[in-house]
C-alpha cells in the first residue's frame, strides 16, 4: 500500500490531494457523516473515524490543509434535506428530532385558531348573502340596431310612437318604472329604472343604447310577474292573518265558554273562613228553642235544634231542606245567567201528589204552581226538582225538560219506576191545565242515574240529595264524594244562617 502511494505521488507530481478528497467528500450521495480514509501523503498514522462534513458551500483551498482540520472540524448545524425513503412514524406522526417546542406549539395553535375564526366569520357573511334576481336580455339583443348620433328625426319619432304604445300596456306594472317617458328620446337605458326597485332588478351586463323594445318588454314582463307574485303573496299573507284572527277569536270564545264552568265549579267548593266556622260552631251549640234565623217569604224558622241536623252523623229534617230550596231559587233570581232556570218543590209536594190512601191526585197540588204564585210556568223551566222522602231515606226525582227525560237519583242507586210514572203524568196534567196544551211525553226517557256519588254511611242521604240539586242547578256534573260531606254540612249551615246560598 505504501509503494502504491509513492507511485501515485510520483505520477501526480505536485497535485494537491486535499482538493481531490474535498471533491469526493462533497459528492451528493454522502450523508451527514462520511468516512475519512487514511491519506496517502503521510497521514496514514491517524485512526479512521466519523467526522461531520458539509454537503455544499464548502470553501475549496489550493493549499494543503493541516491535519488537525479534518480531525477537529468546525461544528455547524447542517441544512435539513427531505428524505427520499420510507420513514418510521413515531410519537403520533413525528419523531423526536422534528417535535416542536411548547412555544412553537402554542404559537401554531393560536395562529391556526385565528385563521379558523376568520374563515368562519367570512363563511357566515357569505352564507346570508341574498342573491339578486338576474334578467338575461342577451338572447333578445341580437337584432338590436344601435342608434347613432346622426339618426334621423323621423326614426326617433317612430320610436317615440312605439314607446307610447308600450306605455299603455305598462300600466299594470304599478309604477315600477317611473321614468319610462325618457325613452321618447330614442334610446332605452336599463339603468334608468326607478331607484326604488334597483335592488330587485339587476342586469348581468351593462346595456347602454337599445333601439329594440324587446328588452324593455322582457324587463316589463318580469316586473309584472314579480308584481303578481307579490300580490299573490300578499293575498296569502292576508288569508293567513285572517285565519289566525279567526283562531284567536274562536280560542277566546272557547275560553269564555270554559271559564264560567271553572268559576262555578270553584264556587261550589269555597272553604269557610275562620269567622264562618266559629259562627257555625256557636249555632250548633245554641239552645233548642233559640230561633237563629227566620225566612219571612217562606215563613220558616230555624232554631238551634233544627239546625243541629246538619252536624255530622245526623239526618236532615224537612225545615232545613225546604229553606235551602228557597235559597237556591233566590240565588237563581240574583244571577239568572249563571244558573239554570229551575223550580224547586218542597219535601211535601210528592206526598200530596201521591197519597198512600187515595193514590195519584193532581188536584191536591194544582194551586201550588199558579202563575200568580210563581210568576212563570213550569214548562218554561229547564229542570224541576222534587225531593222524595221514603220513610227513612231521601232520594231525588228530576223532570228534565231541557233533555226531555225523567231522572231518578238515589245515593244507594235504588230504582223506583212508579215515582217517575207519577211525575210524567203530573207534568202532562200541569201543562194542559196551565197552558191548555196536550204534551206528549211518550218519547221522553226514564233514567235511573248510576254515575253519581254514592253514600257510604246511614245518615248522609239527605245531604247527598241536597248537593245533587245544588250541582244540577249550576249545570255541573256530580263531582263530589263522601269525604266532602262534612264540609257540605258546615257550608249549608253557614248559608242558612246567612239566608243566602252561594
UniProtKB/Swiss-Prot annotation:
Q: What class of enzyme is it?
A: hydrolase
InterPro entries tied to this protein: Papain-like_cys_pep_sf, Peptidase_C48_C
Enzyme Commission number(s) from the entry: 3.4.22.-
Going by the UniProt record, its keywords in alphabetical order are:
Hydrolase, Protease, Thiol protease, Ubl conjugation pathway
Report the active site residues. Answer: 393, 410, 461
Give the matching Pfam families: Peptidase_C48
Report the domain of life of the source organism: Eukaryota
Family of the protein in this entry: Belongs to the peptidase C48 family.
What job does this protein perform? Protease that catalyzes two essential functions in the SUMO pathway: processing of full-length SUMOs to their mature forms and deconjugation of SUMO from targeted proteins. Cleaves precursors of SUM1 and SUM2, and very inefficiently of SUM3. Seems to be the only ULP1 able to cleave SUM3 precursors. Cleaves SUMO peptides better than SUMO-conjugated proteins.
What is the protein name for this chain?
A: Ubiquitin-like-specific protease 1A
User: Which species is this record about?
Assistant: Arabidopsis thaliana (Mouse-ear cress)
Taxon lineage: Eukaryota, Viridiplantae, Streptophyta, Embryophyta, Tracheophyta
